[in-house]
Protein backbone atom coordinates (compact mmCIF):
# COMPACT_ATOMS: atom_id res chain seq x y z
CA UNK A 1 0.00 0.00 0.00
CA UNK A 2 1.11 3.53 -0.73
CA UNK A 3 -0.32 6.89 0.24
CA UNK A 4 -0.25 9.90 -2.06
CA UNK A 5 -1.03 13.54 -1.24
CA UNK A 6 -1.66 16.30 -3.75
CA UNK A 7 -2.29 20.04 -3.56
CA UNK A 8 -3.06 22.72 -6.12
CA UNK A 9 -4.22 26.33 -6.09
CA UNK A 10 -5.12 28.78 -8.82
CA UNK A 11 -6.05 32.45 -8.86
CA UNK A 12 -9.33 33.81 -10.20
CA UNK A 13 -9.09 36.10 -13.21
CA UNK A 14 -9.83 34.11 -16.33
CA UNK A 15 -12.82 34.90 -18.50
CA UNK A 16 -13.16 31.16 -19.12
CA UNK A 17 -15.34 28.63 -17.38
CA UNK A 18 -14.86 27.54 -13.78
CA UNK A 19 -14.32 23.77 -13.87
CA UNK A 20 -13.88 21.86 -10.61
CA UNK A 21 -13.74 18.09 -10.39
CA UNK A 22 -14.76 17.90 -14.04
CA UNK A 23 -17.97 19.85 -13.35
CA UNK A 24 -18.73 23.31 -14.72
CA UNK A 25 -19.63 25.68 -11.87
CA UNK A 26 -21.59 28.86 -12.66
CA UNK A 27 -19.33 31.77 -11.67
CA UNK A 28 -18.34 35.10 -13.17
CA UNK A 29 -14.65 34.14 -13.34
CA UNK A 30 -12.61 31.10 -14.16
CA UNK A 31 -9.18 30.23 -12.78
CA UNK A 32 -5.96 31.37 -14.44
CA UNK A 33 -4.00 28.35 -15.66
CA UNK A 34 -2.22 26.85 -18.66
CA UNK A 35 -4.83 24.08 -18.82
CA UNK A 36 -8.52 24.36 -17.89
CA UNK A 37 -7.47 25.25 -14.31
CA UNK A 38 -9.32 22.38 -12.59
CA UNK A 39 -7.50 22.55 -9.22
CA UNK A 40 -9.46 19.53 -7.97
CA UNK A 41 -8.26 17.20 -10.71
CA UNK A 42 -4.76 18.68 -10.59
CA UNK A 43 -4.48 17.92 -6.86
CA UNK A 44 -5.84 14.43 -7.50
CA UNK A 45 -3.31 13.79 -10.29
CA UNK A 46 -0.48 14.90 -8.00
CA UNK A 47 -1.70 12.57 -5.24
CA UNK A 48 -1.86 9.63 -7.66
CA UNK A 49 1.56 10.35 -9.16
CA UNK A 50 3.11 10.97 -5.75
CA UNK A 51 1.77 7.76 -4.26
CA UNK A 52 3.29 5.80 -7.14
CA UNK A 53 6.58 7.77 -6.90
CA UNK A 54 6.10 8.96 -10.49
CA UNK A 55 6.81 12.65 -10.02
CA UNK A 56 4.15 15.31 -10.32
CA UNK A 57 1.68 16.82 -12.74
CA UNK A 58 4.15 19.50 -13.88
CA UNK A 59 6.66 16.87 -14.94
CA UNK A 60 4.14 14.91 -17.00
CA UNK A 61 2.11 17.85 -18.35
CA UNK A 62 4.42 20.91 -18.34
CA UNK A 63 2.89 24.38 -18.63
CA UNK A 64 5.58 25.15 -21.21
CA UNK A 65 4.07 22.66 -23.66
CA UNK A 66 1.58 23.81 -26.28
CA UNK A 67 0.11 20.28 -26.16
CA UNK A 68 -1.43 21.05 -22.77
CA UNK A 69 -2.63 24.61 -23.45
CA UNK A 70 -6.30 24.74 -22.38
CA UNK A 71 -6.17 20.97 -21.81
CA UNK A 72 -9.20 19.20 -20.38
CA UNK A 73 -7.99 18.02 -16.97
CA UNK A 74 -10.20 14.94 -17.17
CA UNK A 75 -8.01 13.80 -20.08
CA UNK A 76 -4.90 14.42 -17.98
CA UNK A 77 -6.42 12.32 -15.18
CA UNK A 78 -7.12 9.53 -17.67
CA UNK A 79 -3.46 9.60 -18.77
CA UNK A 80 -2.34 9.42 -15.13
CA UNK A 81 -4.60 6.41 -14.56
CA UNK A 82 -3.08 4.65 -17.60
CA UNK A 83 0.39 5.40 -16.22
CA UNK A 84 -0.55 3.95 -12.82
CA UNK A 85 -1.83 0.78 -14.45
CA UNK A 86 1.37 0.46 -16.50
CA UNK A 87 3.34 0.64 -13.24
CA UNK A 88 1.16 -1.94 -11.49
CA UNK A 89 -0.99 0.28 -9.26
CA UNK A 90 -4.71 0.63 -8.68
CA UNK A 91 -6.58 3.08 -6.48
CA UNK A 92 -8.13 1.75 -3.27
CA UNK A 93 -9.81 4.95 -2.09
CA UNK A 94 -9.54 8.73 -2.16
CA UNK A 95 -10.54 11.79 -0.16
CA UNK A 96 -10.46 15.42 -1.24
CA UNK A 97 -11.01 18.86 0.25
CA UNK A 98 -11.72 21.96 -1.84
CA UNK A 99 -10.99 25.27 -0.12
CA UNK A 100 -12.96 28.20 -1.56
CA UNK A 101 -14.67 31.26 -0.13
CA UNK A 102 -16.70 31.62 -3.33
CA UNK A 103 -18.65 30.16 -5.00
CA UNK A 104 -20.60 27.88 -2.68
CA UNK A 105 -19.82 24.35 -3.85
CA UNK A 106 -22.15 22.08 -1.84
CA UNK A 107 -24.71 21.69 -4.68
CA UNK A 108 -21.97 20.48 -7.07
CA UNK A 109 -20.16 18.02 -4.80
CA UNK A 110 -22.31 14.97 -5.69
CA UNK A 111 -21.61 15.44 -9.42
CA UNK A 112 -17.89 15.90 -8.74
CA UNK A 113 -17.86 12.78 -6.58
CA UNK A 114 -19.55 10.70 -9.27
CA UNK A 115 -17.29 12.04 -12.03
CA UNK A 116 -14.07 11.42 -10.12
CA UNK A 117 -15.04 8.05 -8.63
CA UNK A 118 -15.84 6.84 -12.15
CA UNK A 119 -12.51 8.17 -13.47
CA UNK A 120 -10.67 6.33 -10.68
CA UNK A 121 -12.65 3.12 -11.21
CA UNK A 122 -14.04 3.30 -7.68
CA UNK A 123 -17.49 2.76 -6.20
CA UNK A 124 -18.88 5.91 -4.57
CA UNK A 125 -18.34 4.55 -1.06
CA UNK A 126 -14.57 4.62 -1.71
CA UNK A 127 -14.29 8.25 -2.80
CA UNK A 128 -15.19 11.39 -0.89
CA UNK A 129 -15.04 15.08 -1.71
CA UNK A 130 -15.93 18.01 0.51
CA UNK A 131 -15.61 21.78 0.53
CA UNK A 132 -14.74 24.33 3.17
CA UNK A 133 -13.77 27.99 3.47
CA UNK A 134 -10.96 29.74 5.33
CA UNK A 135 -13.44 31.94 7.23
CA UNK A 136 -12.34 34.91 5.11
CA UNK A 137 -8.64 34.51 5.99
CA UNK A 138 -5.81 34.65 3.45
CA UNK A 139 -5.91 34.67 -0.33
CA UNK A 140 -8.78 32.19 -0.43
CA UNK A 141 -10.75 34.13 2.17
CA UNK A 142 -10.29 37.28 0.08
CA UNK A 143 -11.83 35.32 -2.84
CA UNK A 144 -8.61 35.54 -4.87
CA UNK A 145 -8.57 31.85 -5.77
CA UNK A 146 -9.38 28.24 -4.98
CA UNK A 147 -7.23 25.41 -3.61
CA UNK A 148 -7.66 21.66 -3.26
CA UNK A 149 -6.03 18.81 -1.34
CA UNK A 150 -6.22 15.13 -2.28
CA UNK A 151 -5.21 11.96 -0.47
CA UNK A 152 -5.26 8.55 -2.14
CA UNK A 153 -4.41 5.01 -1.11
CA UNK A 154 -2.81 2.96 -3.87
CA UNK A 155 -2.50 -0.80 -4.00
CA UNK A 156 0.19 -2.65 -5.91
CA UNK A 157 -1.50 -5.15 -8.21
CA UNK A 158 -0.27 -8.73 -7.97
Swiss-Prot record:
InterPro entries in the cross-refs: MECDP_synthase, MECDP_synthase_CS, MECDP_synthase_sf
Subunit-structure text: Homotrimer.
Catalytic activity: 4-CDP-2-C-methyl-D-erythritol 2-phosphate = 2-C-methyl-D-erythritol 2,4-cyclic diphosphate + CMP
Annotated positions for site Transition state stabilizer: 34, 133
GO MF annotations, alphabetized: 2-C-methyl-D-erythritol 2,4-cyclodiphosphate synthase activity; metal ion binding
Keyword Metal-binding: yes
NCBIfam families linked to this entry: ispF
Gene: ispF
PANTHER family: 2-C-METHYL-D-ERYTHRITOL 2,4-CYCLODIPHOSPHATE SYNTHASE, CHLOROPLASTIC
Task of the protein: Involved in the biosynthesis of isopentenyl diphosphate (IPP) and dimethylallyl diphosphate (DMAPP), two major building blocks of isoprenoid compounds. Catalyzes the conversion of 4-diphosphocytidyl-2-C-methyl-D-erythritol 2-phosphate (CDP-ME2P) to 2-C-methyl-D-erythritol 2,4-cyclodiphosphate (ME-CPP) with a corresponding release of cytidine 5-monophosphate (CMP).
Top-level taxon of origin: Bacteria
Species in which this protein is naturally found: Nitrosococcus oceani (strain ATCC 19707 / BCRC 17464 / JCM 30415 / NCIMB 11848 / C-107)
List of residues binding 4-CDP-2-C-methyl-D-erythritol 2-phosphate: 8-10, 34-35, 56-58, 132-135, 142
CDD domains, per database record: MECDP_synthase (cd00554)
UniProt cofactor(s): a divalent metal cation
The keyword Lyase is annotated on this UniProt entry: yes
EC number: 4.6.1.12
Protein name in UniProt: 2-C-methyl-D-erythritol 2,4-cyclodiphosphate synthase
Family per record: Belongs to the IspF family.
UniProt record, GO biological process: isopentenyl diphosphate biosynthetic process, methylerythritol 4-phosphate pathway; terpenoid biosynthetic process
HAMAP family documented for this protein: IspF
Cofactor note: Binds 1 divalent metal cation per subunit.
Keyword terms of this UniProt record: Isoprene biosynthesis, Lyase, Metal-binding
Pathway membership, UniProt: Isoprenoid biosynthesis; isopentenyl diphosphate biosynthesis via DXP pathway; isopentenyl diphosphate from 1-deoxy-D-xylulose 5-phosphate: step 4/6
Binding, a divalent metal cation: 8, 10, 42
Xref: Pfam families: YgbB (PF02542)
Amino acid sequence: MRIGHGFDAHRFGSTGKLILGGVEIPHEQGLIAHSDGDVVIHALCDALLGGAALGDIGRHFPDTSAEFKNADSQKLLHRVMVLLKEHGFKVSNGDMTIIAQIPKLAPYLPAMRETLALALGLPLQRFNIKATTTERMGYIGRAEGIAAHAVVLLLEEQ
